């Protein structure tokens, strides 16, 4: 029997990441080849932006995707999130020239408070949310705080781009296919402070630490390279990573919806207090997924170097939260 369509909200739908994302979602790459979807696309209520969104919708029509049951484009969050089952919050205020990080946090807080409240009012009670727009962890925390009637654990931040980057760099170093890299972890914030941890990682079944066998490379080259990859792409391309970010968002939601078959992936989650991370802090941790559910990988040993790196990224997250606390009471 044909499945009932699910509603997928995408914010920032006419932007670079939105454009790289929507066609793959509509083709079934996110929720599977037999799951019809209704796309609910949100963009700024500005004529020029809404016109661009209309153009994207025309292209979606022209693809004649069998799984795309319906779609709407709107400037109203209450319309975009109505009965939504999945939300990909891509739209965020980018950092402008001379803009302090603090100002960026406050500008984005307004957006994610409004969207959190809209979801709280009209979305499915089991909506699953990923925040892609930066600062992703703190934006996800703000949205979660602004939607008190929805399950806190259904709000997540995208660490999958860092996770995929970390896997790819390790595969390159070891000369093995990226598919052979397993049990990668990226702890903390989606920012250059995050900590890609390869201590439990295997490549072709071999311990990654033994294969690499170079602590100095790992600490001084690999970790900073993964952390600064986004900046390197901006320098090379003149634009921020869009297709790889869209790909990571699809990976994240695909695995959450359909499961990982026991494989570890990284998700930014509200902490349950494990690994010494204060409860509620939106923090990247390793998980495995079964359809519709994630489960944290527990009981991993944290050595002194890891503790230092994990606390460093936590400090940044705590400062970000403190910067917007007044707004999300």
Curated annotation (Swiss-Prot):
User: Which Gene3D superfamilies does this one have?
Assistant: Lactate dehydrogenase/glycoside hydrolase, family 4, C-terminal (3.90.110.10), NAD(P)-binding Rossmann-like Domain (3.40.50.720)
Q: Where does substrate bind?
A: 95, 101, 134, 165
pH-dependence annotation:
Optimum pH is 8.5 with oxaloacetate as substrate.
Residues binding NAD(+) are 12-18, 108, 115, 132-134
Q: What GO terms describe the biological role, i.e. biological process, of this protein?
A: malate metabolic process; tricarboxylic acid cycle
Q: Which UniProt keywords apply?
A: NAD, Oxidoreductase, Tricarboxylic acid cycle
**Statement: the UniProt record of this protein carries the keyword Oxidoreductase:** yes
Q: Which residues form the active site?
A: 190
Q: Which superkingdom does the taxonomy of this entry point to? A: Bacteria
| EC number annotated for this UniProt entry | 1.1.1.37
Under the GO molecular function aspect, what terms does this record hold? L-malate dehydrogenase (NAD+) activity
- Free-text activity regulation comment from the record: Substrate inhibition is observed at high concentrations of oxaloacetate.
Q: Which family does it belong to?
A: Belongs to the LDH/MDH superfamily. MDH type 2 family.
Q: Which NCBIfam families match?
A: MalateDH-SF1, PRK05442.1
Q: How does it assemble?
A: Homodimer.
Q: What is the recorded function of this protein according to its Swiss-Prot or TrEMBL entry?
A: Catalyzes the reversible oxidation of malate to oxaloacetate. Catalyzes the reduction of oxaloacetate more efficiently than the oxidation of malate.
| Full protein name | Malate dehydrogenase
- The organism named in the record is Syntrophobacter fumaroxidans (strain DSM 10017 / MPOB)
Q: What gene is behind this protein?
A: mdh
């Amino acid at each position: 029997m044909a499945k009932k369509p699910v509603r997928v909200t995408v914010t920032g739908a006419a932007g670079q990441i939105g454009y790289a994302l929507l066609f793959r979602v509509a083709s079934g790459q996110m929720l599977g080849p037999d799951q019809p979807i209704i796309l609910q696309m949100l963009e700024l209520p500005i004529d020029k932006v809404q016109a661009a969104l209309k153009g994207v919708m025309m292209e979606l029509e022209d693809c004649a995707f069998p799984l795309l049951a319906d779609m709407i484009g709107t400037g109203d969050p209450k319309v975009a999130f109505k009965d939504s089952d999945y939300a990909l919050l891509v739209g965020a205020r980018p950092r402008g020239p001379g803009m302090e990080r603090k100002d960026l946090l406050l500008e984005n807080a307004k957006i994610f408070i409004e969207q959190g409240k809209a979801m709280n009012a009209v979305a499915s009670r089991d909506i699953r949310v990923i925040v892609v727009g930066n600062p992703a962890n703190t934006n996800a925390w703000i949205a979660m705080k602004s939607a008190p009637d929805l399950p806190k654990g259904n709000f997540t931040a995208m660490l999958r781009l860092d996770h995929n980057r970390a896997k790819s760099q390790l595969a390159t170093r070891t000369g093995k296919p990226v598919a052979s890299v397993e049990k990668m972890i990226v702890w903390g914030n989606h920012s250059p402070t995050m900590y890609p941890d390869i201590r439990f990682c295997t490549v072709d079944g071999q311990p990654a630490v033994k294969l690499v066998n170079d602590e100095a490379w790992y600490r001084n080259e690999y970790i900073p390279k993964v952390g600064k990859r986004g900046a390197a792409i901006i320098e090379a391309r003149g634009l921020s990573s869009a297709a790889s970010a869209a790909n990571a968002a699809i990976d994240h939601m695909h695995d959450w919806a359909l499961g990982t078959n026991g494989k570890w992936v990284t998700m930014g989650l509200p902490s349950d207090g494990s690994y010494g991370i204060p409860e509620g802090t939106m923090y990247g941790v390793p998980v495995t997924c079964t359809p519709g559910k994630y489960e944290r990988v527990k009981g991993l040993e944290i050595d002194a170097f890891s503790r230092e790196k994990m606390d460093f990224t936590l400090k940044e997250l705590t400062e970000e939260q403190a910067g917007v606390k007044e707004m999300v009471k």
